[in-house]
A protein has these predicted regions:
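Short beta-strands and strand-coil junctions in structured, solvent-facing domains, enriched
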Residues: 256-257
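Short, gly/Ser/Thr-rich active-site loops of penicillin-recognizing serine hydrolases
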Residues: 165-173, 264-301
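Beta-lactam-recognizing serine transpeptidase/beta-lactamase-like catalytic domain environment
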Residues: 1-5, 10-253, 262, 297-301
Protein backbone atom coordinates (compact mmCIF):
# COMPACT_ATOMS: atom_id res chain seq x y z
CA UNK A 1 0.00 0.00 0.00
CA UNK A 2 0.99 3.64 -0.19
CA UNK A 3 2.75 4.42 3.11
CA UNK A 4 1.93 8.12 3.33
CA UNK A 5 3.90 10.20 5.81
CA UNK A 6 6.06 7.38 7.17
CA UNK A 7 7.84 7.56 3.78
CA UNK A 8 8.95 11.10 4.62
CA UNK A 9 11.88 9.57 6.47
CA UNK A 10 13.14 8.02 3.24
CA UNK A 11 12.68 11.34 1.41
CA UNK A 12 14.46 13.25 4.16
CA UNK A 13 17.41 10.84 4.20
CA UNK A 14 17.75 11.17 0.41
CA UNK A 15 17.75 14.98 0.50
CA UNK A 16 20.22 15.16 3.39
CA UNK A 17 22.55 12.62 1.77
CA UNK A 18 22.56 14.60 -1.48
CA UNK A 19 23.22 17.75 0.56
CA UNK A 20 20.48 19.70 -1.20
CA UNK A 21 19.27 20.79 2.25
CA UNK A 22 20.47 21.13 5.83
CA UNK A 23 18.32 20.51 8.94
CA UNK A 24 18.48 24.21 9.82
CA UNK A 25 17.40 25.50 6.39
CA UNK A 26 14.10 27.37 6.31
CA UNK A 27 11.22 26.13 4.17
CA UNK A 28 8.24 28.35 3.40
CA UNK A 29 5.10 26.24 3.73
CA UNK A 30 3.01 29.28 2.83
CA UNK A 31 -0.67 28.90 3.63
CA UNK A 32 -0.40 25.12 3.79
CA UNK A 33 -1.49 24.42 0.22
CA UNK A 34 0.28 23.86 -3.10
CA UNK A 35 -1.57 23.51 -6.39
CA UNK A 36 -0.13 21.47 -9.27
CA UNK A 37 -1.40 21.87 -12.84
CA UNK A 38 -4.34 23.91 -11.65
CA UNK A 39 -6.23 21.07 -9.97
CA UNK A 40 -4.03 18.72 -7.95
CA UNK A 41 -3.69 20.05 -4.42
CA UNK A 42 -1.23 19.17 -1.66
CA UNK A 43 -2.31 20.45 1.74
CA UNK A 44 -1.17 20.28 5.33
CA UNK A 45 -3.35 18.90 8.10
CA UNK A 46 -3.05 22.25 9.85
CA UNK A 47 -5.22 24.86 8.17
CA UNK A 48 -3.26 27.93 7.20
CA UNK A 49 0.03 26.05 7.12
CA UNK A 50 3.08 26.55 9.31
CA UNK A 51 4.70 29.54 7.61
CA UNK A 52 8.51 29.46 7.48
CA UNK A 53 9.89 26.53 9.45
CA UNK A 54 13.15 24.60 9.52
CA UNK A 55 13.71 21.42 7.54
CA UNK A 56 13.77 19.53 10.84
CA UNK A 57 10.42 20.95 11.85
CA UNK A 58 8.94 20.07 8.45
CA UNK A 59 9.52 16.46 9.45
CA UNK A 60 8.51 16.85 13.09
CA UNK A 61 5.13 18.45 12.31
CA UNK A 62 4.77 16.27 9.19
CA UNK A 63 4.20 19.12 6.76
CA UNK A 64 3.20 17.76 3.36
CA UNK A 65 3.82 21.07 1.62
CA UNK A 66 7.21 21.43 3.26
CA UNK A 67 8.34 17.98 2.21
CA UNK A 68 7.06 18.49 -1.33
CA UNK A 69 9.02 21.74 -1.59
CA UNK A 70 12.18 20.06 -0.29
CA UNK A 71 12.01 17.27 -2.85
CA UNK A 72 10.32 18.89 -5.84
CA UNK A 73 12.28 22.14 -5.74
CA UNK A 74 15.62 20.34 -5.52
CA UNK A 75 15.03 17.39 -7.84
CA UNK A 76 12.48 18.50 -10.45
CA UNK A 77 15.17 19.04 -13.07
CA UNK A 78 16.83 15.69 -12.30
CA UNK A 79 14.28 13.39 -10.64
CA UNK A 80 16.57 10.44 -11.39
CA UNK A 81 18.91 11.67 -8.66
CA UNK A 82 16.17 11.34 -6.04
CA UNK A 83 14.95 7.93 -7.18
CA UNK A 84 18.51 6.64 -7.57
CA UNK A 85 19.13 7.57 -3.95
CA UNK A 86 16.06 5.56 -2.91
CA UNK A 87 17.30 2.65 -4.99
CA UNK A 88 20.76 2.89 -3.40
CA UNK A 89 19.07 2.45 -0.03
CA UNK A 90 17.52 -0.78 -1.38
CA UNK A 91 13.93 0.44 -1.18
CA UNK A 92 12.98 -1.07 -4.54
CA UNK A 93 13.87 -4.65 -3.59
CA UNK A 94 11.98 -7.32 -1.68
CA UNK A 95 13.36 -8.51 1.65
CA UNK A 96 13.20 -12.11 0.45
CA UNK A 97 11.78 -13.30 3.76
CA UNK A 98 10.89 -17.01 4.18
CA UNK A 99 7.16 -16.33 3.91
CA UNK A 100 5.36 -16.79 0.62
CA UNK A 101 3.64 -13.77 -0.85
CA UNK A 102 5.89 -10.81 -0.05
CA UNK A 103 4.86 -7.95 -2.32
CA UNK A 104 7.48 -6.22 -4.43
CA UNK A 105 7.92 -2.51 -3.65
CA UNK A 106 6.82 -0.03 -6.28
CA UNK A 107 9.19 2.91 -6.60
CA UNK A 108 8.48 4.68 -9.93
CA UNK A 109 11.43 5.69 -12.11
CA UNK A 110 11.51 8.75 -14.43
CA UNK A 111 12.11 6.54 -17.47
CA UNK A 112 8.87 4.62 -16.85
CA UNK A 113 6.31 5.17 -19.64
CA UNK A 114 3.66 6.37 -17.18
CA UNK A 115 5.93 8.79 -15.25
CA UNK A 116 4.39 12.27 -15.11
CA UNK A 117 4.81 15.63 -13.40
CA UNK A 118 2.99 14.53 -10.25
CA UNK A 119 5.14 11.51 -9.46
CA UNK A 120 8.07 13.35 -7.87
CA UNK A 121 6.09 15.68 -5.57
CA UNK A 122 3.69 12.89 -4.62
CA UNK A 123 6.53 10.49 -3.80
CA UNK A 124 7.95 13.09 -1.40
CA UNK A 125 5.18 12.42 1.12
CA UNK A 126 4.52 8.76 0.43
CA UNK A 127 2.01 8.64 -2.42
CA UNK A 128 2.54 6.97 -5.76
CA UNK A 129 4.89 4.49 -4.10
CA UNK A 130 4.00 1.13 -2.63
CA UNK A 131 5.85 -0.64 0.17
CA UNK A 132 4.87 -3.25 2.76
CA UNK A 133 4.80 -2.50 6.51
CA UNK A 134 7.69 -4.91 7.10
CA UNK A 135 9.75 -3.20 4.40
CA UNK A 136 9.03 0.14 6.05
CA UNK A 137 9.98 -1.22 9.47
CA UNK A 138 13.22 -2.67 8.08
CA UNK A 139 14.27 0.80 6.92
CA UNK A 140 13.41 2.41 10.26
CA UNK A 141 15.22 -0.40 12.02
CA UNK A 142 18.31 0.47 9.96
CA UNK A 143 18.14 4.05 11.25
CA UNK A 144 18.00 2.70 14.81
CA UNK A 145 20.84 0.30 13.97
CA UNK A 146 23.26 3.10 12.97
CA UNK A 147 22.64 2.65 9.26
CA UNK A 148 22.98 -1.12 9.01
CA UNK A 149 19.97 -2.71 7.29
CA UNK A 150 19.35 -6.22 8.60
CA UNK A 151 17.09 -8.78 6.97
CA UNK A 152 14.14 -9.60 9.27
CA UNK A 153 14.70 -12.91 11.03
CA UNK A 154 11.85 -14.98 12.44
CA UNK A 155 13.91 -17.78 14.02
CA UNK A 156 17.15 -17.21 15.92
CA UNK A 157 17.97 -20.75 17.00
CA UNK A 158 16.50 -24.24 17.24
CA UNK A 159 17.09 -26.65 20.11
CA UNK A 160 15.79 -28.05 23.37
CA UNK A 161 15.15 -25.66 26.23
CA UNK A 162 18.26 -25.38 28.37
CA UNK A 163 20.42 -27.32 25.93
CA UNK A 164 22.89 -26.13 23.35
CA UNK A 165 21.01 -25.22 20.14
CA UNK A 166 21.67 -27.55 17.24
CA UNK A 167 21.04 -24.80 14.70
CA UNK A 168 21.56 -21.04 14.87
CA UNK A 169 20.53 -18.57 12.18
CA UNK A 170 22.96 -15.72 11.63
CA UNK A 171 21.86 -12.18 10.88
CA UNK A 172 22.01 -11.23 7.21
CA UNK A 173 23.07 -7.70 6.27
CA UNK A 174 21.09 -6.27 3.36
CA UNK A 175 22.84 -2.91 3.29
CA UNK A 176 25.90 -2.17 5.46
CA UNK A 177 25.31 1.59 5.36
CA UNK A 178 22.15 3.24 4.08
CA UNK A 179 23.51 6.74 4.72
CA UNK A 180 26.25 8.78 6.36
CA UNK A 181 26.67 9.24 10.11
CA UNK A 182 25.83 12.93 9.70
CA UNK A 183 22.49 12.10 8.10
CA UNK A 184 21.80 9.42 10.70
CA UNK A 185 22.34 11.85 13.55
CA UNK A 186 20.05 14.40 11.91
CA UNK A 187 17.09 12.10 11.28
CA UNK A 188 17.47 10.33 14.63
CA UNK A 189 17.07 13.70 16.32
CA UNK A 190 14.05 14.54 14.16
CA UNK A 191 12.38 11.23 15.02
CA UNK A 192 13.09 11.83 18.71
CA UNK A 193 11.54 15.30 18.47
CA UNK A 194 8.38 13.89 16.84
CA UNK A 195 7.58 12.48 20.28
CA UNK A 196 9.61 14.67 22.61
CA UNK A 197 8.77 18.20 21.42
CA UNK A 198 5.41 19.78 22.11
CA UNK A 199 4.91 20.48 18.40
CA UNK A 200 5.74 16.91 17.37
CA UNK A 201 2.90 14.93 15.83
CA UNK A 202 3.30 12.15 18.41
CA UNK A 203 3.93 14.25 21.50
CA UNK A 204 0.80 12.64 22.97
CA UNK A 205 2.73 9.36 23.53
CA UNK A 206 5.69 10.92 25.32
CA UNK A 207 6.56 8.81 28.35
CA UNK A 208 8.63 9.74 31.38
CA UNK A 209 9.95 6.19 31.88
CA UNK A 210 11.52 5.69 28.46
CA UNK A 211 12.02 7.61 25.23
CA UNK A 212 10.47 6.84 21.84
CA UNK A 213 11.61 7.93 18.38
CA UNK A 214 9.38 7.53 15.36
CA UNK A 215 7.07 8.94 12.73
CA UNK A 216 3.32 9.17 12.34
CA UNK A 217 1.53 8.37 9.11
CA UNK A 218 -1.97 9.02 7.80
CA UNK A 219 -2.56 7.73 4.30
CA UNK A 220 -5.72 8.17 2.27
CA UNK A 221 -6.98 5.09 0.47
CA UNK A 222 -9.82 4.77 -2.02
CA UNK A 223 -9.27 8.47 -2.73
CA UNK A 224 -10.37 8.06 -6.33
CA UNK A 225 -13.86 7.20 -5.09
CA UNK A 226 -16.48 9.19 -3.21
CA UNK A 227 -15.72 7.33 0.02
CA UNK A 228 -12.25 8.22 1.30
CA UNK A 229 -10.82 5.87 3.90
CA UNK A 230 -7.51 5.94 5.76
CA UNK A 231 -4.62 3.83 7.00
CA UNK A 232 -3.24 5.26 10.23
CA UNK A 233 0.27 4.29 11.26
CA UNK A 234 3.16 4.85 13.60
CA UNK A 235 6.61 3.34 13.19
CA UNK A 236 9.63 3.80 15.40
CA UNK A 237 11.96 2.38 18.01
CA UNK A 238 12.70 2.54 21.72
CA UNK A 239 14.46 3.47 23.91
CA UNK A 240 15.44 6.33 21.62
CA UNK A 241 18.91 6.83 23.13
CA UNK A 242 19.85 3.12 23.07
CA UNK A 243 17.47 1.42 20.63
CA UNK A 244 16.60 -2.18 21.41
CA UNK A 245 13.18 -2.66 19.84
CA UNK A 246 11.48 -1.38 16.69
CA UNK A 247 7.81 -1.68 15.86
CA UNK A 248 5.21 -0.61 13.32
CA UNK A 249 1.48 -0.22 13.95
CA UNK A 250 -1.10 0.12 11.17
CA UNK A 251 -4.82 0.61 11.63
CA UNK A 252 -6.84 0.04 8.46
CA UNK A 253 -9.98 2.12 7.95
CA UNK A 254 -10.34 3.52 11.49
CA UNK A 255 -13.64 4.99 12.61
CA UNK A 256 -13.40 8.49 11.14
CA UNK A 257 -15.84 9.85 13.71
CA UNK A 258 -13.39 8.95 16.49
CA UNK A 259 -10.26 9.98 14.60
CA UNK A 260 -8.06 8.78 11.79
CA UNK A 261 -4.70 10.54 12.19
CA UNK A 262 -1.75 8.29 12.97
CA UNK A 263 -1.04 10.30 16.12
CA UNK A 264 -4.51 9.62 17.50
CA UNK A 265 -5.15 6.07 16.29
CA UNK A 266 -1.86 4.20 15.84
CA UNK A 267 0.67 5.98 18.08
CA UNK A 268 -1.14 5.14 21.37
CA UNK A 269 -1.14 1.46 20.36
CA UNK A 270 2.62 1.67 19.77
CA UNK A 271 3.05 3.19 23.22
CA UNK A 272 1.06 0.41 24.88
CA UNK A 273 3.16 -2.22 23.13
CA UNK A 274 6.35 -0.40 24.12
CA UNK A 275 5.26 -0.07 27.76
CA UNK A 276 4.38 -3.76 27.93
CA UNK A 277 7.80 -4.73 26.59
CA UNK A 278 9.69 -2.14 28.62
CA UNK A 279 8.04 -3.16 31.89
CA UNK A 280 9.18 -6.76 31.31
CA UNK A 281 12.86 -5.79 30.93
CA UNK A 282 14.87 -6.40 34.14
CA UNK A 283 16.21 -3.09 35.39
CA UNK A 284 19.74 -2.59 36.65
CA UNK A 285 19.84 -1.27 40.21
CA UNK A 286 23.04 0.46 41.34
CA UNK A 287 24.44 -1.03 44.55
CA UNK A 288 27.05 0.43 46.87
CA UNK A 289 29.42 -2.42 47.69
CA UNK A 290 30.26 -0.80 51.01
CA UNK A 291 26.71 -1.48 52.11
CA UNK A 292 27.14 -5.23 51.60
CA UNK A 293 28.27 -7.17 54.65
CA UNK A 294 30.60 -10.08 54.03
CA UNK A 295 28.80 -12.37 56.48
CA UNK A 296 25.26 -11.66 55.31
CA UNK A 297 23.15 -12.91 52.44
CA UNK A 298 21.89 -10.33 49.97
CA UNK A 299 19.39 -10.92 47.21
CA UNK A 300 19.45 -8.46 44.37
CA UNK A 301 16.92 -8.30 41.54
Amino acid sequence: HEPGSTFKLMSMVAALEDKVIKPSDLIDTGNGEILFFGKHKVRDSRKGGYGKISVSKVFEVSSNTGMVKIINDNYKNNPENFVDRLYNMRLHKILDIPIIGEARPKIPYPSDPDWDGLDLPWMAFGYGVSITPLQTLTFYNAIANNGVMIKPKFIHKIGRLGAKPHKTYKSEILNPSICSKETLNAVQEMMFNVVEKKWGTANNIKDEMFSIAGKTGTCQIDYTTNSIEYISSFVGYFPADKPKYSCIVLIHKPNKLKGYYGSIVAAPVFKQIAKKIYSAIPKEIPVNLKDLKSNSTNSLL
